[in-house]
Amino acid sequence: MGKLRHIAMQVPDPAKAAEFYMRVFGMKKVGETDWENARGVYLSDGVINLALLNYKTVDAAGAERGVDYVGIHHLGFWVDDLAQTREAIEAQGGRYWMGEAVAGGGFYEVKYCDPNGVVVDITENGWGGAVKNVVAFDPKVEA
């Protein structure tokens, strides 16, 4: 079975977006790109690769989205401390959108919007079928 390990988002300013995800969720910068189709920053939490891209042409972005399109629908982070993460999101320019954690450990998440308006779920309880901690393939990478 395939495992989700890469998410790409179209953002207006990849470096600024990268700062948000690095400061709030502790993601690490693993690469950059700047070529004829796009410029971008690549981040990872040790399991998932997140590409923050700004496409330069309609052909590269896809005609159905165009160069002004921003985002995917949402992505989710399984966090250790919900209250601390909420504070960090707001301190970095994110805003609360909807939802609250379910008492007693239900799976529902709290939804925020990052500074670009992309929906970010946060939860201490995880999602069905998801594994919070994994063993890193590369021992130099913290999982």
Give residue spans per PLM region.
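N-terminal beta-strand motif that seeds the catalytic metal site of vicinal oxygen chelate
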Residues: 1-16, 72-77, 126-143
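Core segments of cupin and vicinal oxygen chelate
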Residues: 2, 8-50
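Vicinal oxygen chelate
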Residues: 3-12, 41-44, 63-143, ...
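Short, charged/polar surface micro-motifs in flexible loops or helix N-caps
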Residues: 46-50, 57-59, 82-84
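Conserved beta-strand in the GNAT
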Residues: 51-53, 121
